[in-house]
Amino acid sequence: MLKSTPTGNVGEPDTEFQVRVLEASDPETSTSSSDSEHQTFVGHADASTKSSVEKLSEPKLTHAPPTKVLFLDGVRGLAAILVVAQHSKEYLQGFNLGAVAVDAFFVLSSFLLTWLFMKKSMKLLAQEAGIRSWIFALVDYFSKRFFRVYPLFAITAIGISFMSAEAQRRYFLFLNPGDFDLYQVLTFEFNHRQFVLWTLPLEISYYFVIPVFVLAILGMRRFWWVAVVPLTVWVVHQGVYEYRTSHTPLEPHIPTFLAGSLAAVVFVKLDVWIKSTGFKFRWWHTLMLRTVEGLTIAVLLSVCFKGLFFDWVEPNPVPTAKGFPFVSALLTTIFVIEMIRPSCVSTMFEWNVLRYWGKISFSVYLLHSFVIWNPTISAQPKYFNRLFARIFLLLLLATTSYYLVEYPSQLLGQRISRFLATRETKGSGSLVKFACMERITMRKKELQ
């Protein structure tokens, strides 16, 4: 059984517990679909109209606790901090931890999106849904991704266009004033992906791969492993021997994204098998998982810090090469184990500080150069004056950006998702119902 995070009060209803978990997590990393959210909300609304006799006569339904995914927010937060440290030219230098963080972003994105789309696709296949439902599912998928990442990216690019040539050179590393072309940046032209702007086109490109990948895997039914095993071998081979670095096309980074997607497939299949068979972990199962996880963490830390167990136990068998270190397979192994059998590792990453950094990580990633390369802060003679000024101002800037741009964009994406779900299920009368549901939602928020 998958573990869930306790709420603290044993007597709290299961529904409140689920809402707390889902609201605490980033909307895009939540395990719930819009359908489940609607069912929970409508259930509360219907319950208020039932008589007390009906309520007493109804049997209590037991709901499975939501999957524990909060630690992934903490992983994203740590990755954002590592990017800032790498670009600061002052903290944790010499280890290329920024590259590790970028790979972590890529893996998290592909893992979560593959997982969510696969669950949605399995549901549609079980319902024998028609082409109309599949079209709505794809529109919902792409609209959520668009409103999650593009608005802040576009506003940042527009803001850069109004900056002086000196500011563009200082904060986004433009060598010449003519290097910046707003239209080329907004349309992801390859030669206009300066500084941190190079990663978003790669992620968006892979968004189009995920639906094809998921449907291909599901089409193989019980022979899904026939594709997963050789693809896993290929990912490891490419990660070890292929050169990858920043500001390159998607092709050399496909193994990184694919590692996350393969991990999502393995997790979904294992999760379904565990629930369908009623499998219970015995002590020796847990011991085996912890041994594999411990060895994986040891190798991951050794790769990141270029030593440790490679100096103490065994030299690194992988040939050293320039470019990004290969960590995607190690990260996904840890993710799957923690999702199946959580431990203190996931609990550690559920620390609220890391999870908050994870919530604002996209703003931190795009805007951190305005703080860490600010000449006034950099001119401070004392180390801790610079450190705390950067932390405070970066948190302030990223939080402001999140609540002014990211959060409203996500709400708009969720609103569109609810509208699409209503249109799909109710057809022509859906617009009226959607408006009523929106008013009920707003009323509920006011009462809270």
Map each language-model feature to its residues.
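Membrane-cytosol interface segments of multi-pass membrane proteins
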Residues: 1-242, 249, 253-256, 272, ...
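Active-site environment of divalent metal-dependent phosphoester hydrolases
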Residues: 90-91, 265, 369-374
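Transmembrane alpha-helix segments characteristic
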Residues: 228-232, 332-334, 367
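Alpha-helical transmembrane segments and terminal signal-anchor/GPI-anchor hydrophobic tails
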Residues: 251-353
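Generic helix-packing signal
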Residues: 264, 362-365
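Hydrophobic alpha-helical transmembrane segments in multi-pass integral membrane proteins
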Residues: 301-307, 365-378
